[in-house]
Amino acid sequence: ITHYVGIAVRQAGDDNVHSYRIPGLVTTNDGTLLGVYDVRHQTNIDLQEDIDIGMSRSTDGGQSWEPMKIIMDMGEYNGLPQGQNGIGDPAILVDERSNTIWASAVWVHGLANARAWRNVKPGMTPEDGTGQLMLVKSTDDGKTWSSPINITSQVKSKDMTMLLQGPGRGITTQDGTLVFPVQYKSVNRQLRGEIAIIYSKDGGKSWHRSNA
């Protein structure tokens, strides 16, 4: 009989955080486990709230985990508080050719704690009140991470009110293409969502969106 033991990597109240949600998990080329998730500081409610992206790392197959690191935090952009600069719903992937790790998340700016999916607006910039698709990357097996990279202008059209990654994980295809699933809605579709992928054929230097 095989017995499996679950390990609680993050629990409500850890590091004085209200809730942890929306996990994604990958194994790097070196066998390291990397988990990403929403760090929901004050409440378990979805964006727009005070939310950052946390990361946990294990080099022994998940038996032990290093202390949590915050890898995406949009701070008080434009002078607005953290609660109006939340970033959440992460996905993570490993570039199997280079072992570069990419994490994606959606940043929402200035909604004053309104629910993002219903209240974001069309446009391209944070000041437009539209969702921003952000990436970070690690080139040292998840030990350190880049500053956030905004790829909204590469993959979003102006009529879309919200474009965000599909939470969880992305993939590397056999030809080395990096792929994240995405979901979006546009002005003429109201609350109805559509799905597509974003992909990079140059190791993450540029990104493109497929048709729905």
Language model features with spans:
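Asp-box/BNR beta-propeller blade signature and adjacent active/binding-site loops
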Residues: 1-212
